[in-house]
Amino acid sequence: MKVMAIQMPIKDGDVEANKLKVEQLLDLHSGADLYLLPELWSSGFFIDKWQDIAENSTPELLRWLSQEAAKRKIYLAGSLITKNDEGNYVNRLTMFNREGKLMVEYDKVHLFLPMGEGFLERGQKVNIVEIEGFRIAFGICYDLRFPEMFRKLALKTVDLFLVVAEWPKERYDALINLAAARAIENQCYLLLSNRIGKDCFRESFAGASGLYGPWGPIVFSYDEGAFGGEINLNDLKAAREVLNVFDERVEGVDF
């Protein structure tokens, strides 16, 4: 299966401009099975407009994502500000299948309070879905700093993590190392989609979108575009046979 992470600048609060950019990049980089969009790809962290976007733009954006997935016959995932069933605002990653049907929703568990996410409701569960033989789970940005979340999911035999982010350039070393570590320690693939460019507050973003595997980074970039590659279950199996860390885990020790 070929998976690609879209890496793009985001115009904060400009939904239509961001949607057009996604269309352009999907057109330019056709041929993959699965595409992943950055965290809050339609709005950025323009918090003053989040409520308006959640109520007036997100429903149409979800329909548009569904239509794009069906039209292009791809799996398409990314995160948006929206409301949950209780009416609370959440940072939600959604994925649509090749027929445009909603497959899964994941609400960000670890909220990044310094960026104003405190008024959002944190997620309570990470669902695992299966696509073409690959078991897939999800993370959003700050989640990467919490290895126990990824390990608990990996123990349920996850083959691919999809992680979206708006990770700043000043901490790009941490991003690359954390993405690689989550893939290496859990002997799986991790597809990362991060933002590039600057936001309306002049914050620069790190890029590094791409594919990370059980032996480390496979491909990543700091440029606009789509980055990833072919993933193979046989390669994962081979890596897990060389170093069988799951069978050799020692539990019950009082460290």
Where does each model-flagged region fall?
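Extreme N-terminal starter segment of soluble prokaryotic enzymes
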Residues: 1-5
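Hydrophobic residues at beta-strand termini and immediately following loops
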Residues: 6, 53, 106, 129, ...
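Short polar catalytic/cofactor-binding loops
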Residues: 7-13
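Cys-nucleophile CN-hydrolase/nitrilase-fold catalytic domain and related Cys-dependent amidase chemistry
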Residues: 15, 23-98, 105, 168-184, ...
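Short, acidic/polar
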Residues: 17-27, 145-151
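Structural motif
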Residues: 33-34, 136, 160
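CN hydrolase (nitrilase-like) catalytic-core segments centered on the catalytic cysteine
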Residues: 57-77, 145-228
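Active-site catalytic loop in hydrolytic enzyme cores
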Residues: 84-156, 170-177, 237-255
